[in-house]
Amino acid sequence: MAHLLGSQACMESLRTDLTDLQGAIVDVFSRAGPVRFPSWKFPDRMACDLDMVALLEHYDHVPGDPEFTQLSHAVLLELVIDRLLLLLQSCMSYLENLGSEQMMPPAQAAGPCMSVGLTVRRFWDSLLRLGTLHQQPLPQKGANQRETPTSKPTTKGEPARSPEYLTTKLIKPSSPVLGLPQTCQEPESIPVRASLQFPATTFKNTRSVHSQTIETALVPCDACASVQGSLQKVGKVVISLCQSQNLPSSLGQFQQLVQDSMGLRPLPAATVGRWAAEQRKDLTRLSKHVEALRAQLEEAEGQKDGLRKQAGKLEQALKQEQGARRRQAEEDEQCLSEWEHDKQQLLTETSDLKTKMATLERELKQQRESTQAVEAKAQQLQEEGERRAAAERQVQQLEEQVQQLEAQVQLLVGRLEGAGQQVCWASTELDKEKARVDSMVRHQESLQAKQRALLKQLDSLDQEREELRGSLDEAEAQRARVEEQLQSEREQGQCQLRAQQELLQSLQREKQGLEQATTDLRLTILELERELEELKERERLLVAFPDLHRPTETQIHGGRSSSVESQITCPTDSGNVTDHMERQVQSNDIRIRVLQEENGRLQSMLSKIREVAQQGGLKLIPQDRLWSPSSKGTQGATPPVQAKSTSPGPLGRQHLPSSRTGRTLLGQPCTSPPRQPCTSPPRQPCTSPPRQPCTSPSRQPCSQPSKSLLEGVTHLDTCTQNPIKVLVRLRKRLSPGRGQASSAHQPQERPM
């Protein structure tokens, strides 16, 4: 066998076997409910929660990796053992349910981890107990045949059937019809089993009633097909929404698994319950995603306001900067014109100074010639000349104080006049000439220095002008870029603003629709509360007769017939039988009146819905977002509501175990097993002829499904505005009243 490890043919055979085993397990789960035992392969997880599709995709034959292929082969063998063990455990649970005469088991806790041998032994023990239980009613068959009269036919073309025929069918059931849902097969045998528990003397005043059996029900009812079709359409819409939002879809995986295992056959009750649970997960995930999108929208609106304020500030800053640059350019132009004017003036002054310097040089030559003549006379005045030289040095150091130097020269001239009268005229002339020459020299030097400074300043001004022109060009280019960027940002901001305004308008419309739906729901809740108070008052009136609840009569239901029933009156130990019968008649009158009032309300509500559908009030959302086809129009949205009222499936039985009204209006204690209110009465709309009225007192347990129908009908107008949220609300409304039957269908959800 070692050479076969990793063989592709062997692995494909194992994968096929695993697929078949999983299909058989799903079929058993639909009849017995999911069993919660630890997995043999993965002890830390439940066997019913393993994702076989993901495991088969992971452990596959890889041509380039022999080690992984051999590991996958071993894992597939272990998975075959795990699935076989789970199949035995689920079959064991199904056999226990048959032995205890229960339709579906209650919610089971996680079972212990069992070995293969222990599981096989427990399965064999359960099978032996079932065989013993089926052999016990056989001795009573002859007595039932002798004491039970032949039943009369109730409809044309149908033969009469006796209770012994039904008992034989129960003890030796035939193979189920292919494609018939389990919800329409199993409940038939339960009332007949209950009838076997009473003595044979009770059949003297009884008569058998015709009912629809497995042989007559060749196809599933239209209501089941309609409900499942609507559920699949809604599931497709939910899966498409999850895919469009890039969200994981639990319903998509479960739908693929159901299609692989069931194909196009009708789904059983447990599969429909699991489908609804997975769909509820996806709807919850979508609601969380919508809340996150709303938070992002609010954050985007805040950012939009901030960007709008920032854009206004930038526009103001840009305008201020443009004004400052404009003023700076005007000032620069004015300074440039002033500098040009000063330059022309300086050029004219320099030309004038040059001509003056030439004339002064000629005068200086003449004065030098005259001073040479006067030098002979100036020998006597050397001391004064030294002082004059010192004064000349001081005059050279203090160029700016020209007037003070001239005053000092005049003082020196006065001193020279005082020193000698002889050289007064010569000294004064010499001083004047000297002062004039010195002033001319100083003036020439100052002019030259001023000219050099002006030339340097002119060069610096030229350089600064070039720099200013370059900076002005750069500023113009930058301003153009800033204007272009601001224009693009303004256009982008306007586009974003328009998009956000459109989104805001759509959200406001959705908000208005939700507010309208909330108002309608509140009005519906108030109306339902008033009806609940009335029903409680009527229930108190019925409870006021305690004698009616004594075990004085027993009902025997044949098959699924609830329109006609036989009552067997047994002698009581206390009271008068006539009084009890009169009180029973009074209570039956009260029940009939309650049913007539409820039928009147349902008829009025149905007429209102039809009027709204004819007026086109249900066309509020595009057809591609609804679960009904676009070709059906407004009337295509009403079949799911009607399917709720006539479906015998799990939707019709979910409210019955938790309804007090359905139990107290029967006028007798619940002597039969607790499954009786959930089997025959709710299934009558699927099997009874259309012409039979549903007015029998034994069908009073149907009042709770009618109430759920009223709740579904009143919320139909809100489905057109937001179908996803309404589905979530309807699922939450239906989930508290499912009772034990619904909890048995509900699988254990994995932690997200």
Swiss-Prot record:
Lineage: superkingdom: Eukaryota
Transmembrane regions: none
Compositional bias per record (Basic and acidic residues), positions renumbered to this chain: 316-329
Alphabetical UniProt keywords: Coiled coil
Keyword field contains Transmembrane helix: no
Residue numbers spanned by region Disordered: 135-163, 316-336, 620-707, 731-752
Biased composition regions of type Polar residues, renumbered to the chain: 135-154, 628-648, 693-707
InterPro entries recorded: CCDC157
Coiled coil regions, renumbered to chain: 276-544, 579-615
Compositional bias ranges of the Pro residues kind: 671-692
Record protein name field: Coiled-coil domain-containing protein 157
Provenance organism: Homo sapiens
